[in-house]
C-alpha cells in the first residue's frame, strides 16, 4: 500500500530582502518527471516548466512564507521552520509521513517527519517542494523588481551581490529588506550616525 508522503523544502534563507518561502508537496505513486532535481541545479526556464507540471500532477501542494518582519523577530532559522510548518498545515490532504530537506524538523507538525540532508537531490517529493518554493520566491523578487527596478531584484534575486549592495548604498533600505542581516543592519547603523 502506498504511504502518502510529503516533501518539504525552503527557498530564500540567504537573501537580504523578501520573505523566506517553503513548499510541501504530496506526489502520486506513479509520478515521474524526468529532470526533476534540486531547484538550484535547474535553469529558471526549466524550473518554471517543472513547477507547472508539479502543480498539475501533485496529489496536493501548498506554498507558504515568513515575512521579513517575522525573520527579524524570530531569526532566519526559526522563520524558515515557521514557513515550513505553514506549508505542511496548508495541505488539504494530510500526509502520513514528511521528509524535510536539511537537518532540522519544525516543531508541532503532529505527523511523523524525517530530516534528510541534501534531500532535494535524493527524494522526489523534496525536489518538487524545492522547485515550488524557489519559483514562489522568484515571483516575489520579480514583483519587487517591478516596484523598484533600480535595485535589480530580477537579476540577483535579493542576494548580497555587488549590484545589490551598491543599490542599497545609493537608494537606501526598503521596507522589504531584512534589517537583521549584516549588510542591511550595518548600512542602517551608518546612516544613523549622519
UniProtKB/Swiss-Prot annotation:
| InterPro entries assigned | RNase_HII, RNase_HII/HIII, RNase_HII/HIII_dom, RNaseH-like_sf, RNaseH_sf
Signal peptide limits: none
Among the GO molecular function terms of this UniProt record, one is: manganese ion binding
Which PROSITE patterns does the protein's record reference? RNASE_H_2 (PS51975)
Cofactor binding remark = Manganese or magnesium. Binds 1 divalent metal ion per monomer in the absence of substrate. May bind a second metal ion after substrate binding.
GO terms under cellular component: cytoplasm; ribonuclease H2 complex
Class of this enzyme: hydrolase
Binding of a divalent metal cation, residues: 9-10, 101
For biological process, the GO terms are:
DNA replication, removal of RNA primer; mismatch repair
Q: Which cofactor does it need?
A: Mn(2+); Mg(2+)
**Catalytic reaction list:** Endonucleolytic cleavage to 5'-phosphomonoester
Keywords from the named record: Cytoplasm, Endonuclease, Hydrolase, Manganese, Metal-binding, Nuclease
Q: Which domain of life is it from?
A: Bacteria
RNase H type-2 domain residues = 3-193
| Cell compartments where the protein resides | Cytoplasm
Q: Kindly give the Gene3D superfamilies that the UniProt entry links to this protein.
A: Ribonuclease H-like superfamily/Ribonuclease H
* Alphabetized Pfam families for the sequence: RNase_HII
Q: What is its EC number?
A: 3.1.26.4
Stated role: Endonuclease that specifically degrades the RNA of RNA-DNA hybrids.
Membership in a protein family: Belongs to the RNase HII family.
Its protein name is Ribonuclease HII
- The scientific name of the source species is Neisseria meningitidis serogroup B (strain ATCC BAA-335 / MC58)
Q: Which gene encodes it?
A: rnhB
